[in-house]
Amino acid sequence: MPVKAGINGFGRIGRIVLRNALLHGDIDVVAVNDPFIDLEYMVYMFKYDSVHGRFKGSVEAKDGKLYVEGKPIHVFAEKDPANIPWGSVGAEYIVESTGVFTTTEKASAHLKGVCKKVIISAPSADAPMFVCGVNLDAYDSKYKVISNASCTTNCLAPLAKVIHDKFGIVQGLMTSVHATTATQKTVDGPSNKDWLGGRSVGNNIIPSSTGAAKAVGKVIPSLNGKLNGLAFRVPTVDVSVVDLVVRLEKPASYDEIKQAIKEASETTHKGILGYTEEKVVSTDFTGNDNSSIFDRDAGIALNKTFVKLISWYDNEWGYSRRCCDLLGYAAKVDGAL
């Protein structure tokens, strides 16, 4: 029997998590909560998507519920997570995708009645972070609130793990060339905490900070303090790319590095770390399920210990798929599946 799940926040990630959950045999989404989107608008937003296209199945509002493929999904509109009646519909696992309740304390408001676990679809300051293909073996059922880290960490960490396990990473710097997200401005506007973040997204390349590289040290402890990074926000609607420059402990040719990544993509990291030999651009990865897709021909080496590696990721779709995978994995370990 699939585990019953709820989604709090029906924004970009919430909606795409639902699309992915419908393809995931272990998850049955029984409820969605969003105080800012009424039911009829939920139908519209789920049906039409400017990036991922129109939903191919049926979606409608009926009897106060959201019906997707003929299946009813309860809809709530509570601002306070503590007031969401997850228990009334039997939702045991909650995807917290508002981007607001990202600490253990705030996300724990969901934990009452039958609710067993909260998966935060964002980095968290204090909740344990888990990245599929990297550190799931560290998961323990005692954790009630966990984080799926960020989309960029999900791209970087599997690549870094393969390289570190095979050749050893002495140190590295990452640049993420990141597509537009909902927090950015269409025209110049106020952004007191991040002045650059207030500049218009449509006609600028915007330098930005990211904690993705440092977060790798949390999921791969042996890399703690060895990686750092920054980001550029660019005027594209989806799909981002990681540029990782590393100094290797064990000398290796670029061909040897490519082969190690290719082998991992076909074995230990299949479905997580992809590998492409095609001549590709960003839109070619829209809807790609992998967390990270290594671009064989885009990287370069200065010598056998200093290399630049390029890996793509659909920061919406691939990340949302990992939210579902993490939920399913946790449920199995917890004995809920």
Curated annotation (Swiss-Prot):
Under which pathway is this protein filed?
Answer: Carbohydrate degradation; glycolysis; pyruvate from D-glyceraldehyde 3-phosphate: step 1/5
Q: What GO molecular function annotations does the UniProt record carry, in alphabetical order?
A: glyceraldehyde-3-phosphate dehydrogenase (NAD+) (phosphorylating) activity; NAD binding; NADP binding
Q: Tell me the residue numbers annotated for binding D-glyceraldehyde 3-phosphate.
A: 150-152, 181, 210-211, 233
Q: Where is this site: Activates thiol group during catalysis?
A: 178
Could you say which EC number(s) this protein's record lists?
1.2.1.12
Which chemical reaction does it catalyze? D-glyceraldehyde 3-phosphate + phosphate + NAD(+) = (2R)-3-phospho-glyceroyl phosphate + NADH + H(+)
The family assignment reads: Belongs to the glyceraldehyde-3-phosphate dehydrogenase family.
NCBIfam families referenced in this protein's UniProt entry, alphabetically: GAPDH-I
- The protein's name: Glyceraldehyde-3-phosphate dehydrogenase
Q: Which organism is it from?
A: Phanerodontia chrysosporium
